[in-house]
C-alpha cells in the first residue's frame, strides 16, 4: 500500500463516517495513526472533535488489522483542552435544561478517556506540543507517552478558576508521577516541560520533533511482534493493577491471564522452539495451528 493509499480522512472511509476533524493514517503495517485535526485551535477539546474521536476509537478497537494505535495532534499542539472561544453544540440534548446539557457534555469527554483505556490495542501518545488541561488527561489515558522537545504539560483547570481535577486527572497523574509531584503540579498550575516530564516519568521518552513519530512507530512495531492475546491481557493487567485493591487479588487475575494463554495457545512452546530449531518465532494465538500471527 502506498503512502497516498494509506492516508485518508475518516470521512473517506465508508465504514468510518465521521468528520475530517480526526484523520486516520496507516503509516506502518499494523499501526494506525490518529491525528486530532484542528491545528488553528491547537486541537482543543470542542465537542465536535471529541465526538469524532470517540467514533474512531469505537471502530478501531474492532479493526483486527491494527495492532497498535498512535495518537497525535496536527500543527504545533497536541491538545489544548477546553476552548473558551470556540464551542460546538452538545449532541442529542434537545429538550434538556442547561445544567443537564453540561452534564451530557462532560459525559462525552469522559467516554473518550475511557475509550482510550479500553481500546483492545495499546495506545502510544505522540505528544508533539502543548498538552493542556483536558489535553493532559488525554495523554495520560494513553498507555505509553512520547514527547517532542517542544511539548509541555499543564493542569490548567486551577489557572481558569476551576478545579484542576477533571477527566480522571487526579486519578491518573499520581499513578504516573507519584502523589507529591501530582499535588504540586495540579495545585500550582505550572508548566512541566518535556525534559522534566521525562525525568519524573510522565513520558517514557523525549525526542526531537523530527524523530517523534518514527520513535513511536518503532515502539509500535516491537509491540506488534508479540501475540495479540498476550499484548491485550498485559494492557488489561497493567490498568487493572492501578485499580487493584490488594496485591493478592491482582496476582490472582494475572495468574488467570497467564493460564488462559498457556492452555488455549501453543505460544509458550513456540517461543522456545526457535532456539533449538534455528527459525523465526511464529506466535499464532491458537493451539496446534501453523498460520501466521494475528
From Swiss-Prot:
Gene Ontology BP term (one): fatty acid beta-oxidation
> What keywords are annotated for this sequence in UniProt?
Fatty acid metabolism, Lipid metabolism, Lyase
The EC number(s) given in the record are: 4.2.1.17
Q: Check the record and name the Gene3D superfamilies matching this protein.
A: 2-enoyl-CoA Hydratase, Chain A, domain 1, Lyase 2-enoyl-coa Hydratase, Chain A, domain 2
Q: Name one GO molecular function term.
A: enoyl-CoA hydratase activity
Its EC top class is lyase
Q: Does the keyword Lyase apply?
A: yes
In terms of domain of life, where is this protein from? Bacteria
Kindly state which reaction or reactions the protein catalyses.
Answer: a (3S)-3-hydroxyacyl-CoA = a (2E)-enoyl-CoA + H2O; a 4-saturated-(3S)-3-hydroxyacyl-CoA = a (3E)-enoyl-CoA + H2O
The keyword Lyase belongs to this UniProt entry's keyword annotation? yes
**Family from the record:** Belongs to the enoyl-CoA hydratase/isomerase family.
Q: Do you know which NCBIfam families this protein is assigned to? A: PRK05864.1
PANTHER family tied to this protein: ENOYL-COA HYDRATASE ECHA12-RELATED (PTHR11941:SF130), ENOYL-COA HYDRATASE-RELATED (PTHR11941)
Give the protein's biological function: Could possibly oxidize fatty acids using specific components.
Q: What is this protein called?
A: Probable enoyl-CoA hydratase echA12
Organism encoding this protein: Mycobacterium leprae (strain TN)
Question: Lineage in the entry?
Answer: Bacteria, Bacillati, Actinomycetota, Actinomycetes, Mycobacteriales
Gene encoding it? echA12
